[in-house]
């Protein structure tokens, strides 16, 4: 399959047939098997909170996953990342830790380094691979090297604007990449500091907003098309993509649109024909593998107006809130969230 090509979204009866086709999990997914069951009595510690800009999202994710795991019969403790954490882990020796931390320290590999230092099993990608995925330009470089497509971009540190003057640099950006553009921090999630720039006079304000969340900005050519989020899960049988979720919003898909119910419309599975859905899913799996990710990830892409799947970014700690995309995809696949999360935990239970 050529993962850089595709066809426009199906409509009418064809779209309905395609959605019906992918909603049958036995046809496309082989995620959960009898040997994935976790023995009763397991103790899971969920790390949620932290000090990043995404603290509240992390806490909401932690509560949701804890509810599902408890319903699946596991003992669950939620703990913040603070001075009590390491003594707590030493005293309680949980079977596995699940870091549901978003933003710095949670996704940049730091907390995973610490968990490995103290010998605690955990759900998710390792430290080195997390660091690569956390950096948007590094992740784009890796997936481009793997033969996938991604919008043209440039990275610019804040210091460069002080040294060269902002306007000449921004003029050069527009001359090279054109308009519209997307400005985003090179690190971070939840669309914090992200701006869609339609006119050149909007670019200076977008840079100021971006630099509020980091010292380096990634400016990429904006792509028009169908916005999709594709979650990948690996329970030890190889990575498999859940049904892509189509994201439709009247304005930018910003923080409020992501986490306030009713601001955004989601279609799970996406309203695309079966062949295109397969291509989109393959792109997400290839990105997951190229970056060396483990257990779960979410890849954000756009199916552009030429039918090309454009990689935007990847998340090693996908949100698990009531409006988050991985849970929506799992439900679209007919999967029980408690069983899915329990199976992810089982892969790392302390033996």
Q: Where in this protein do the model-derived segments appear?
A:
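Glycine-rich phosphate-binding loop of ATP-grasp-fold ATP-dependent ligases
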Residues: 58, 151-155, 180-205, 227-229, ...
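Hydrophobic beta-strand scaffold residues
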Residues: 76, 121-122, 150, 181, ...
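ATP-grasp fold ATP-binding core
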Residues: 143-144, 173-191, 215-224, 228
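Rossmann-like NAD(P)H-binding beta-loop-alpha module
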Residues: 146-185
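Phosphate-binding site of ATP-dependent enzymes
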Residues: 198-282, 303, 308-310
């Amino acid at each position: 399959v050529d993962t850089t090509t595709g066809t426009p979204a199906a409509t009418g009866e064809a779209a309905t047939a395609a959605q019906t086709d992918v909603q049958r999990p036995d046809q496309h997914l082989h995620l959960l098997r009898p040997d994935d069951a976790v023995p009763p009595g397991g103790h899971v510690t969920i790390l949620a909170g932290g000090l990043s800009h995404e603290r509240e999202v992390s806490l909401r994710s932690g509560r949701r996953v804890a509810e599902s795991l408890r319903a699946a019969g596991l003992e669950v403790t939620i703990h913040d990342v603070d001075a009590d954490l390491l003594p707590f882990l030493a005293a309680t020796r949980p079977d596995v830790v699940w870091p549901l931390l978003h933003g710095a320290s949670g996704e940049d590999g730091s907390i995973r380094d610490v968990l490995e230092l103290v010998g605690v099993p955990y759900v998710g990608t390792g430290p080195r691979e997390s660091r690569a995925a956390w950096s948007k330009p590094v992740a784009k470089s890796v997936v481009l090297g793997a033969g996938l497509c991604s919008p043209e971009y440039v990275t610019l540190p804040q210091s460069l604007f002080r040294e060269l003057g902002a306007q000449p640099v921004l003029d050069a950006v527009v001359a090279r990449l054109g308009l519209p553009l997307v400005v985003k921090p090179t690190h971070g999630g939840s669309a914090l500091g992200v701006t869609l720039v339609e006119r050149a006079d909007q670019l200076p304000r977008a840079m100021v907003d971006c630099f509020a969340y980091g010292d380096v900005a990634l400016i990429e050519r904006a792509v028009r098309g169908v916005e999709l989020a594709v979650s990948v899960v690996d329970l030890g049988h190889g990575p498999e993509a859940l049904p892509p979720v189509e994201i439709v919003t009247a304005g930018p898909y910003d923080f409020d649109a992501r986490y306030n119910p009713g601001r955004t419309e989601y279609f799970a599975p996406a309203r695309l024909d079966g062949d295109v859905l397969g291509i989109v899913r393959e792109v997400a799996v290839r990105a997951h593998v190229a970056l060396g990710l483990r257990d779960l990830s979410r890849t954000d892409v756009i199916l552009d107006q030429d039918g090309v799947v454009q990689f935007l970014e990847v998340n090693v700690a996908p949100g698990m809130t009531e409006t988050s995309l991985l849970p929506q995809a799992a439900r679209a696949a007919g999967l029980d969230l408690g069983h899915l999360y329990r199976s992810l935990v089982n892969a790392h239970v302390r033996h």
